[in-house]
């Protein structure tokens, strides 16, 4: 399967902004951290491929970003406690494993019940197209490590590790191509 990835500068902007603050450095212009940051990331951000992606994204203007994975099953609630109650990390549902400090082995059991039998890629794409959307992006693998595609490097994926057994990313990519909508994926390198 050949997936065409789109560059979305807004996604990267949050991590690779003009200042490197927090765990990445002081953010002080001219500091050793900033000089290293600029040497590594600025050439990447201005490559011809990235510029073409940036131009394409600006022309498309309107699209859909789907954040979906094992965490979706919990709905922001773990053992009766809402995500907002205690824990560490961002207060958003896709961070439930970290925020509620769920042990990996316990969290991985969610794959046993991940079975979205009503998923229909063509219907999702039809809805996007009918709304005038020009692109669709989905989390192919979030920070929890569970892939929504058939991975050659891990069985912790929708095809090998869940009762659903279908490649969601492949189905969406094919439906987007058929409908003439650009397709992209968000892929987290965390837990690779």
Where does each model-flagged region fall?
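Sec-dependent N-terminal signal peptides
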Residues: 3-13
């Amino acid at each position: 399967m050949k997936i065409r990835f789109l560059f979305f500068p807004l996604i990267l902007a949050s991590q690779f902004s003009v200042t490197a603050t927090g765990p990445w450095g002081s953010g002080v212009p001219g500091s050793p951290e900033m000089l290293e940051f600029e040497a590594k990331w600025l050439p990447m951000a201005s490559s011809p491929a990235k510029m073409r992606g940036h131009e394409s994204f600006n022309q498309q203007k309107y699209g859909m970003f789907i954040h979906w994975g094992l965490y979706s099953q919990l709905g922001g609630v773990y053992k009766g406690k809402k995500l907002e109650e205690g824990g560490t990390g961002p207060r958003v549902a896709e961070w439930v494993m970290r925020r509620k400090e769920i042990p990996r082995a316990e969290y991985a059991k969610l794959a046993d019940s991940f079975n979205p039998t009503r998923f229909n890629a063509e219907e999702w794409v039809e809805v996007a197209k009918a709304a005038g959307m020009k692109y669709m992006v989905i989390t192919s693998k979030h920070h929890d490590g569970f892939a929504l595609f058939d991975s050659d490097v891990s069985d912790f994926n929708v095809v090998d590790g869940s009762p659903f057994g279908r490649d969601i990313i492949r189905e969406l990519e094919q439906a987007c191509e058929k409908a003439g909508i650009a397709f992209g994926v968000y892929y987290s390198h965390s837990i690779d």
